[in-house]
Amino acid sequence: MEKLLHYVWKHRILPLGDLSTTDGRRVEVIDPGTHNSDRGPDFFNAKVLIDGMLWAGNVEIHLRSSDWYRHGHDSDAAYDGVVLHVTQDADCEVTTSQQRSIPQVCLQVPAALAADYQTLLHTDEFPRCHHILASMSPLRVHGWMDRLLAERMQQRAGQVMARVDAFGGDWERACFVTLCRNFGFGLNGDVFERWAKCISLQAAGKHRDHLFQVEALFLGMAGLIGHAFAPEESDLAMRTQQEFDFLANKFSLTPTLQYADWKYLRTRPQNFPHVRIRQIARLYHSGQAQMDALLNVHSVQELHERLGAAGLSASATRLILINTVAPLLYAYGSSRGEEKWTDRATDMLEELPAENNRILRVWKECGLRVTSAADSQALIQLKKMYCDRLDCLRCQFGYAYLRSSAARGDRQGGTTESTDTTDPLG
């Protein structure tokens, strides 16, 4: 409930009558301040008038005043700049580490708002705010989708950069591992990443021109040679094993994975790990899995053709473009401060058609436009980072839902008015 009190303060859903401190001084909120999600006071740089005197500083919010002491703020100098303490229950006075008494305001969450917030949290429906979506302005919806897409790209680029850092700035290796992980298409993603990290690109590079040797190396390191061939291909399986044994001895390689590590159940034949590893081998052999090759492509169609040549279906190719190529380009551009790469990544998503899955079909049924991969990636981000975490208070859709509650409470003769028109993350 404290999060909801933050929401009420941030968006100035304040009493219709005069707001006053616990000792009777009139309070007027000029600026609620900037919400702080890190350590320290909840709102920075707020401005309030207390009995006509302007106070500029920080605001701290608790359900009870005694929480101030329970959290140790009375002995923490980081809270000495607090000029107003907002609480639902003023059960004691509060002071700073310098023994300065802090004015307090009792602020209640409007009943209609609290009820609708509880409905959002406890409904089994998805999305919880579905009935408000059709009435939202296209401008607000599109603005929120743009921010969600940027958030998702930054998050996925961060995952790429973590690999780059882990590999000592080696973009080529980070590219290979990122690509291989996404060839797991979810179910085998973690295992593919483990496998890719075991591959010696130095060893593979010495035999890149020979596809048979690359396949033998890749399948052998995956522990899958004995499961990658049909019974009538026993001779080929034996030669592949012999080739891998030769390469493993030459480069002192030891397989760390075995068949049991891979998931075959509930996997379609085209997604069997050994099938995907052969496709990766063909990409590596042709040079299309290299970072330079991805950076120097000129169109989505060209990328489609390059990846398709490795035996990927059109839908699998699109997923690799969305989940591998776009994040790599975005990460590369962000790390170098070059927008041409980040723009190319987002342009690629806007050009590619949206994925087709259950989550996106539900959003479509709610009236949202889902035509490109940019749209679908934004809505996947919304589902994973907001809906699944019940983080409705930071969501534009949740904001619109709860704002209607505040307005309804006012119309019904309630005690609140919402004067704020900013978005929940601003």
Language-model region placement:
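Internal, well-ordered alpha/beta segment that forms a basic, Gly-enriched binding/recognition surface
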Residues: 86-204
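Elongated alpha-helical scaffolds
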Residues: 77-88
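Catalytic micro-motifs at enzyme active sites that drive phosphoryl/nucleotidyl and oxygen chemistry
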Residues: 32-37, 45-50, 67-75, 90-96, ...
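N-terminal ordered "arm"
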Residues: 7-66, 79
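Hydrophobic, aromatic-lined core segments that form the binding pocket/scaffold
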Residues: 148-378, 391
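Acidic, carboxylate-rich catalytic segments that either coordinate divalent cations
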Residues: 365-408
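Short, low-complexity, charge-dense intrinsically disordered segments
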Residues: 416-426
